[in-house]
A protein has these predicted regions:
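Predominantly flavin-linked oxidoreductase catalytic cores and closely associated redox partners
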Residues: 118-119, 126-260
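Redox-cofactor binding/interface segments in oxidoreductases and associated redox assembly factors
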Residues: 21, 56, 171-175
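Hydrophobic anchor at the start of a short beta-strand
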Residues: 18, 39-41, 103, 169, ...
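Glycine-rich active-site loop/strand segments that organize a redox cofactor
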Residues: 58-107
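Extreme N-terminal leader/targeting segments of oxidoreductases
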Residues: 1-18, 36-37
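N-terminal Rossmann-like FAD-binding beta1-loop-alpha1 element of flavoenzymes
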Residues: 16-43
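A cross-family phosphate/adenosyl-ligand binding-site feature
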Residues: 113-115
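Glycine-rich FAD pyrophosphate-binding loop
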Residues: 35-59
């Protein structure tokens, strides 16, 4: 995996074994695991700091994983099975424990004992610094091309364009859920095909419950299409002016989006 791009680029350009685009939970965890194995790794993050969404997950409690993770719960079990067999719930818990974050289980969900996302973000940042990972924030990747057996990535950083050279690139830039940016365009520019994307793990839009906006309740939700039951879940729901939110809505939202 070691890069041989020593002659690439001009002075000031940076060369790595792996460049990760995106410093969310997945990108940062990937960087830490690679660096622990001695890989020279860098991360380019568009936002002003890493792990922005991680800080908000689980209503600030930081839901790290689920004890019921199984290939059978995915639309394509055969595709995801090798990944989950190699790195499942036990491995996830062990990884966080190695960073000083013991976990506990509640209602099938894994949370840090501190019950606060801040301790997870701080542990990630501390690991990045300890392992010497090159983290560049406010750095938006704008182009990628194959170059001398690896890749050349252009990024707008601090008002200037910088080039990164890496033998391997990991795309961990997420979807277009809130950014308004086409984060998949870099991959398609390399010739990869994309499938149609729909919202998942998202509120379900509706204006039927304005009178009870802000109310939380434990409820059962059944999603139907004609006489067919598409999903049947029970959990907490949060009524909003313009949507149903909460864990119940999130668990129904994927089937809802596909049914539209």
């Amino acid at each position: 995996m070691k890069t041989d791009l020593k002659a690439a680029g001009n002075r000031g350009d940076e060369r790595y074994d792996v460049l990760i685009i995106g410093a969310g939970a997945a990108g940062t965890a990937c960087a830490i695991m690679l660096a622990q194995k001695g890989v020279r790794v860098a991360v380019s993050e568009r936002d002003a700091r890493a792990c922005v969404k991680l800080a908000a997950t689980g209503n600030g409690r930081c839901n790290l994983s689920n004890s019921a993770v199984s290939p059978a719960r995915y639309n394509d079990p055969i595709f995801v099975a090798p990944a989950l067999q190699a790195f499942g719930t036990a491995e996830t818990a062990a990884f966080f424990a190695s960073l000083g974050i013991p976990v506990r289980e509640k209602d099938g969900r894994l949370y840090p004992y501190g019950n606060n996302s801040g301790c997870v973000v701080n542990a990630f940042v501390a690991a990045v610094e300890r392992l010497g990972i090159r983290m560049t924030v406010s750095s938006e990747a704008s182009g990628i091309e194959r170059f001398r057996g690896g890749y050349r990535v252009r990024a707008a950083t601090g008002g200037e364009e910088k080039e990164f050279f890496a033998a391997n690139v990991v795309f961990a830039c997420g979807s277009n859920a809130t950014s308004g940016k086409d984060s998949l365009s870099l991959m398609t520019s390399l010739g990869y095909k994309r499938t149609a994307c729909v919202p998942a793990i998202a509120p379900i839009p509706t204006a039927l419950f304005k009178g009870v906006s802000g109310v939380r309740a434990i409820a059962r939700g059944i999603l139907t299409s004609g006489e067919e039951i598409l999903a049947d879940r029970r959990g907490e729901v949060l009524f909003r002016d313009d949507a149903l939110s909460g864990m119940l809505a999130f668990e129904l939202s994927s089937a809802y989006a596909r049914a539209l």
